Amino acid sequence: AEGVEKEKQVHLFSNYATLGIGNYGTLNAELFVNQELTANDYVGGMFRHLSSQGGIKDVELKDSFYDTALDLTYGVRGNELAWNLDLGYQNQIYNWYGMPMGFGSSLFPSDRENLIDGINPQQSYNNIYLGGKVEISDNIVKDASLKFNHFSDAFDSSENRFYVKPTFEFGIDNLAIKTNVVVDYLGGSFEKNYFNSNIDPLKYE
């Protein structure tokens, strides 16, 4: 129609990086890269980091934290078959620095200081995963995704999760049927319970 102007196509970037710096020594960084290897296959990666050096006023325990993650992917795109494989790792280190009101107020100042110095508020978490997805044309299995994730922490906690989710699509007479099936397993263990009174690790599935 007359007078209608076509919008300018938005330029999309395959790679980008961001960096932010704030008070308390805060650093926020992110890097994403994607590279076409051939007309059909590609690789990609994502790096993320968020941290603070701490220093909050009147906090008597260490209050810094770190959160770093790396994700990698490789994929192939075809007319009848497309798939990708993903690998990732995340490390988080936190200091749980909160204390009850009046903590150690009944002690002599030197004894209270020694008590606080003996507290280790640090906890670390680790996640590593491997997963992928496949899409198939003209097949009863339309697509399927799967992922394995392992979690651990500084206190010997451990957790494994594995799931598979295929999608089936087929026809019966003139009826089209599409359904998902999910297989999801979760299991792990804790070295100590809340009261630190157990002898053997606590396991669950």
Where are these regions (language model features)?
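N-terminal periplasmic/intermembrane-space "pro-region" immediately following the signal or transit peptide
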Residues: 1-7
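Flexible loop and strand-edge segments within Gram-negative outer membrane beta-barrel domains
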Residues: 52-71, 86-165, 197-201
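Gram-negative (and chloroplast) outer-membrane scaffold detector with strong preference
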Residues: 75-82, 127
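Residue-level signature of outer-membrane beta-barrel architecture
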Residues: 35, 76-78, 134-138, 168-175
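Internal metal/ion-chelating core segments
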Residues: 163-205
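Outer-envelope beta-barrel architecture signal
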Residues: 11-15, 39-43, 79-85, 140-144, ...
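Outer-membrane beta-barrel translocator/receptor signature
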Residues: 8-58, 62-68
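Transmembrane beta-barrel strands of outer-membrane/channel proteins
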Residues: 19-21, 47-49, 85-91, 144-150, ...
